[in-house]
Amino acid sequence: MAATSTRGNPSLGDIFRSVGVLAGVIAAIALVFNLLNDPEPRLPGPVDYQPALAVAREEYGYPVLAPEPVPDGWRATSVDFAQEETGDLWKLGFLIGEGDAFVGLEQTDGEIQSYRDDRLADFAAEGESTIDGVTWERLLEDDDQPDRALVRVDGGAITIVRGTVSYEELEEFVRLLR
């Protein structure tokens, strides 16, 4: 024999009250979620890359580059360096202005062709840039909002400068590398 409710069938008012309680709980959860989540994307804060740069320059077997001086309105937001079995890696990233553009610098003396193929898989050659008498390969990403890159292999290391800016702006950045 099946158990039966002592109250019998719920009335229409009971159903409305139950739905109202559930709607209130869902609304409270949504309100808390919206208050805790900032609708504006937060840009990364600036980082001081000088200590990492000093270590990399002392430890690595190739000239580790960084811009000197950093252009006005540019801020370093990422730095990464690692000594790995495959080679020494140096990365430095900058946001420009309000963060709508970036420029990144990558260097390694590891497996150069493999690193290049991995980092620039969706890029196609677009010619060359000559900067202070040095030739850099121009590459353009195959994307709706393509990155551009300047690439150079020298002294057993590859240097990749890429970003969402024009080739001319990338060239100006390269001129600042020391």
Give, region by region, the residue ranges found by the protein language model.
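Functionally constrained cores in energy, signaling, and assembly domains
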Residues: 18, 28, 106-109, 117, ...
